[in-house]
Design a protein with these regions (language model features):
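Glycine-rich phosphate/pyrophosphate-handling loop used in enzymes and phosphotransfer proteins
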Residues: 1-284
């Protein structure tokens, strides 16, 4: 309740500051916004609200696996088709190996941890420009409007309703240098304003920033660095498998290779979660 009041007060003060002291102009059209974010009502509708409605009304235009928009493909994008073929080849190799070694243990493939991913906005173009304003220019008011977008998206997706969301944990060095994390801001609004369940159960060790690495190095950079954290309510002897819900959503801002989502999903699966879905604002 106190956090909710603080968030509403912060929005009110941000808007007052924007109207009286430092008027904000729209990043795209130049009109005064009257709010604490650089988006006028028309551009907000076009860039934030309408893509959510389009995503909900046209699910067939997005990849059923990674959530990226399809160009000419059907059901799966080109990248996911290649991954599915690779996965099937690995399974075939494992079956042959099991026969030779008289062992029935299946090969655990990284992508098996994550059932599917939902995304809403393309990162390329205006989406990336807005995300950079939010993350790099410290315009934290964007968390409020993106939380509204996610809440609307979940409302239109029965598969995601009443499922706890697990925020992707930030690197400790990032919090130390920046002082805040956009995913935590987003989670606070979802939790306090829209009453959506948030489960902060993952922890991350320091490492290089993912955005500075090639696709090949992103997975190795995260190996062993994302894990379940033990909460105060857990006894030393208690198994984490008994407290995690069977179904969870991993919440992140951008999906590029899916490495971060997969390592988070792996940690949740190790804790006993049976089904993990990714939900990202942007696809790159």
């Amino acid at each position: 309740m106190i956090k909710r009041i603080k968030l509403r007060a912060l929005t009110y003060l941000r808007n007052i500051y924007a109207r009286i002291i430092c008027p904000q102009v729209c990043f795209f059209c130049g009109e005064e916004t009257g709010t604490g974010i650089p988006l006028c009502s028309k551009c907000l509708q076009k860039e934030i609200t309408e893509p959510v409605l389009f995503r909900l009304k046209n699910p067939e235009k997005f990849c059923s696996s990674c959530g990226k928009i399809l160009i000419s493909e059907k059901e799966f994008c080109t990248d996911c088709r290649a991954k599915l073929r690779e996965k099937e080849n690995l399974r075939t190799e494992e079956r042959e190996k099991s026969k030779k070694e008289d062992c029935a243990k299946p090969l655990l493939i990284q992508s098996d941890f994550l059932k599917k991913v939902y995304t809403i906005y393309p990162y390329k173009g205006r989406g990336g420009e807005l995300l950079r304003l939010w993350k790099n220019q410290n315009m934290r008011g964007f968390a409020e409007i993106y939380a509204s977008a996610i809440a609307s998206f979940i409302e239109g997706m029965p598969e995601l309703q009443n499922v706890p969301m697990v925020p992707v944990p930030p690197r400790p060095k990032k919090i130390k240098s920046k002082g805040w994390d956009q995913i935590e801001d987003l989670s606070l609004y979802l939790e306090q304003i829209y009453n959506l369940p948030i489960l902060r159960c993952l922890k991350r060790m320091d490492g290089a920033s993912q955005k500075s690495l090639s696709k090949e190095k992103r997975a190795s950079n995260l190996k062993g660095k994302i894990f379940l954290k033990r909460q105060k309510s857990f006894s030393k002897s208690e198994d984490l498998k008994t407290v995690l819900p069977e179904k969870l959503i991993i919440l992140d801002d951008v999906m590029t290779t899916g490495a971060t989502l997969n390592f988070c999903a792996a940690a949740l699966k190790e804790g006993g979660c049976k089904e993990v879905i990714g939900l990202c604002l942007f696809f790159d």
